[in-house]
Amino acid sequence: MRHAGHRLCLGFLLLVSAVPAHAETYRLRYHASLFGLPIGRADFTSILDKNRFEVTGRFASAGIARLFERTDGTVTSKGRLAGSKVVPAAYALDYRSGGKRETTAIRFSGGRIAETVVTPRPKKRGDDWVAVTKADLADAMDPLSALLSPVESAAEVCNRRFKVFDGEMRADIVFSPAGQNEQIRGAAVTCKVRVLPVSGYREGRSTITFLREKARILVAFTPLGAKGHHTPVEALIGTKIGTVHVSGQPVN
């Protein structure tokens, strides 16, 4: 599998989900750690207007993780904002990992996925591959544009479900309110998140089973501006080897 689950998590964690009334630029820097040791970093810039958006980011492995596998990449999503709807136009991911380069480009037409190009071209799939169908892609968005849908209240932040496609995997990302004992300290809103693979994966793979049935993911949001919009600033992501902690800070 071509790191599909990793790309999905990257998409919804490293995103500024604000929609101001006029064009503004927001920059956030994120750091990821495991057992207190740095494993990754990312810088994201979001340009948001009343009728358009563009999100660009650079990410890289860090610390001990970089000793084992050097990863560097960029990701971009752009499109239109039409009232309360997000209409994606293009998504591009370009990264190198372990000396190999992979790229993904998704083109949208009328807000629907029109073309997907992945290089190098994926190898022939086995009988255990759950193929992505045309029906699966209906109303699907890329990982970055998905969370740009505006909300009018904090209560709505944790009551959302997104159809996401990253070029290989189609998954549903489901937000629900976190319990009283699950709140991230200092956060205005904490959501539980489930990533439910729909297609574009190998059946029986332990990573997929863990993601669907056991992964514990919490994401903290904070208000951004005076319009009731929110942005993710912290996350706890359960993995098979431990909990990854992601924290973000504004960059001037």
Question: For each of these PLM feature ranges, what is it?
Answer:
Residues 17-20:
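N-terminal signal peptide c-region/cleavage motif recognized by signal peptidases
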Residues 1-9:
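Bacterial N-terminal signal peptides that target proteins for export
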Residues 114-177:
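A charged, solvent-exposed segment within the mature domains of Sec-exported extracytoplasmic proteins
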Residues 15, 51-56, 120-124:
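Short amphipathic alpha-helical segments, especially helix-boundary/capping motifs
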Residues 10-14:
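Hydrophobic helical h-region of N-terminal Sec-dependent signal peptides
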Residues 22-110, 152-252:
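Acidic, serine/threonine-rich low-complexity disordered tracts
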